[in-house]
């Protein structure tokens, strides 16, 4: 802390407090995460950006998926039957969420980890899929293909809450598990 404080003081003395640009991450998109240091940075007089650097994209995706750009309440995961952790080492980087996942698991939820890296989270999964790096989209397309082909989609819900499902179904029609397996390095059974 002394080293950081000394460096801050040197920068402020030489260039002004605006020369310090804090980087902020929203973590699991919670307001607590994104606003944690606001009072300190304001008091210091540091430069500020609105939101996190990736916030606009994450917020738009969350709003489209969940109906709100603020993310979902992580405690709702305890009611899940299936939790898919895709490209995230949750046990290491989102430690406050892992106990909620364990609670869901104790209630019967299955945890699938999809990640090109074998992480501590992957080691804890009920099922670990390790696609080749950069092949996530092929796997996603094949998963959608199977959901539609095997009539695992709630058509009534889709009709009431989505737009363009028919276009999506047409787009994924050629993304068979065999095609995805060739791209991802996974087996067709996976």
Question: Each predicted region: which residue ranges?
Answer:
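Cofactor-pocket helix-loop regions in the catalytic cores of large enzyme subunits
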Residues: 1-190
């Amino acid at each position: 802390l002394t080293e950081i404080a000394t460096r801050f003081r040197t920068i402020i003395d030489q260039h002004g407090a605006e020369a310090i640009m804090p980087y902020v991450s929203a973590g699991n998109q919670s307001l607590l995460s994104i606003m944690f240091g606001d009072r300190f940075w304001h008091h210091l007089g540091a430069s500020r950006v609105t939101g996190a650097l990736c916030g606009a994209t994450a917020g738009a995706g969350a709003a489209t998926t969940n109906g709100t750009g603020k993310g979902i309440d992580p405690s709702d995961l305890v009611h899940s039957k299936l939790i898919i952790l895709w490209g995230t080492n949750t046990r290491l980087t989102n430690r406050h969420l892992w106990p909620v996942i364990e609670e869901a698991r104790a209630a019967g939820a299955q945890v699938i980890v999809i990640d090109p890296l074998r992480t501590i989270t992957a080691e804890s999964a009920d099922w670990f899929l390790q696609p080749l790096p950069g092949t996530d989209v092929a796997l996603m397309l094949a998963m959608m293909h199977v959901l539609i082909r095997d009539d695992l989609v709630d058509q009534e819900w889709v009709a009431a809450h989505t737009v363009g499902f028919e276009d999506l179904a047409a787009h994924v029609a050629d993304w068979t598990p065999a095609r995805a397996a060739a791209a991802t390095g996974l087996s067709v059974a996976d």
